[in-house]
Amino acid sequence: MADLLSDGELVFVGLNSHHALLAAAVAKILHRKRIRVVTVAEGYEPSLADLPVRRSTGDPELARIGTVLPTVEAFDLAQKGKVDVMFLGPAQVDGETNINVSVIGSLESPKVRLPGGAAAAFIFPLVRKAVLWNFRHSVRSLVRRVDFVTATARNASNDVLLCTDLCLMRYDRERKAWRLASIHPWSSKEEVLGSTGFEVIADAGFVVTRAPTEEERELIARLDPDGLRL
């Protein structure tokens, strides 16, 4: 996911987004990208090189080692179009960019209650680039229709990407469908399509995802000694 970040971007990392925080660290520390990071713990530009990943990326330590930026201010930045990237980790994603972090099953009688979307419905369509991540790629998480629409970018014009443990997809607004952008080295087109509950455009345009370097692996292992990313 670090490769999806670019110079000059303001990046918002949400709650329990360990993968997103590590991606930002790799992009900033190793790739030398001039990104600015805002966390849900109200930390602005925390020193990522000095911070081991905790069980919650809402850890106030993130604010202590950086400037405090109240969450309401981050929302104002999104409203003004100044948040370039937001990472979101939904339990379900469907073929229209609808995401679900609310309930599995019906709202009236849910099988599972999820953490909720906070301001996802507000921010998701406003950021210039939304990076969704779900590292349990299956027909249960990438579904034909989410059980509950917590947020959507269906009627927006922003760039929306979906990173899983099998591939990277980008939403094609002209075709109104997800397009396969890259397949991870350990996966295949057949596995991706067979594990996805919605239509995926899988023409000849996709590539093989770059494997992480040894230096990247070492940094990730140092920042996440407890393996919370796994």
Where are the regions that the model predicts?
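Intrinsically disordered, low-complexity segments enriched in small residues
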Residues: M1-L21, A25, N158-K176, E199-L230
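Alpha-helix boundary/capping detector
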Residues: T39, I123, E218-R222
